[in-house]
């Protein structure tokens, strides 16, 4: 018989840097989950990733105080900013441009995000990434 689910917890945690301090500790503690067990498992799974890259994670909490978690790919905005070499997007995205990325960089981001995007094919995923970049004030060349 399947375990009874008592809730889902959605967090964004830097890769390899999960620790019991907020936001991880309070979110897991109020469900009665073992915080250190999660931190060790998360840090072990994110070992190969770039340290500090924010990773969305969905934790499923069960009634017997056990849990499972699913990691998603890093947010598209973070990957776009990294590719463009900027700290933050434009305050006025359609008038002030803050950086540029190429179509090849957009394709690379789309491939990394492909599991989380609902696009039918790679070209549609690239257009989705390009739209996100434009809304941040970053120009996409070759599109």
Swiss-Prot record:
Keywords, comma-separated and alphabetical: Methylation, Ribonucleoprotein, Ribosomal protein, RNA-binding, rRNA-binding
GO annotation, cellular component aspect: cytosolic large ribosomal subunit
InterPro entries, per database record: Ribosomal_uL11, Ribosomal_uL11_bac-typ, Ribosomal_uL11_C, Ribosomal_uL11_C_sf, Ribosomal_uL11_CS, Ribosomal_uL11_N, Ribosomal_uL11_N_sf
Gene Ontology MF terms: large ribosomal subunit rRNA binding; structural constituent of ribosome
Gene3D superfamilies named in the record: Ribosomal protein L11, C-terminal domain (1.10.10.250), Ribosomal protein L11/L12, N-terminal domain (3.30.1550.10)
Keyword Iron part of the UniProt annotation: no
CDD domains associated with the record: Ribosomal_L11 (cd00349)
Reported modifications of this chain: One or more lysine residues are methylated.
GO BP terms, alphabetized: translation
Record family assignment: Belongs to the universal ribosomal protein uL11 family.
Assembly: Part of the ribosomal stalk of the 50S ribosomal subunit. Interacts with L10 and the large rRNA to form the base of the stalk. L10 forms an elongated spine to which L12 dimers bind in a sequential fashion forming a multimeric L10(L12)X complex.
Job of this protein: Forms part of the ribosomal stalk which helps the ribosome interact with GTP-bound translation factors.
Protein name: Large ribosomal subunit protein uL11
Provenance organism: Ralstonia nicotianae (strain ATCC BAA-1114 / GMI1000)
Lineage: Bacteria, Pseudomonadati, Pseudomonadota, Betaproteobacteria, Burkholderiales
């Amino acid at each position: 018989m399947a375990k009874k689910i008592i809730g889902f917890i959605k967090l964004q945690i830097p890769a390899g840097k999960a620790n019991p301090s907020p936001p991880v500790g309070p979110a897991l503690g109020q469900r009665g989950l073992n915080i250190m067990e999660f931190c060790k498992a998360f840090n072990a799974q994110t070992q190969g990733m770039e340290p500090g890259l924010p990773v969305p994670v969905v934790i499923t909490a069960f009634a017997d105080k056990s849990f499972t978690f699913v990691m998603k790919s890093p947010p598209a905005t973070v990957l776009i900013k990294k590719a463009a070499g900027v700290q933050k997007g434009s305050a006025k995205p359609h008038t002030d441009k803050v950086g540029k990325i190429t179509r090849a960089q957009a394709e690379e981001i789309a491939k990394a995000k492909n599991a989380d995007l609902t696009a039918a094919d790679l070209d549609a995923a690239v257009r989705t990434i390009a739209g996100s970049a434009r809304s941040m004030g970053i120009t996409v060349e070759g599109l």
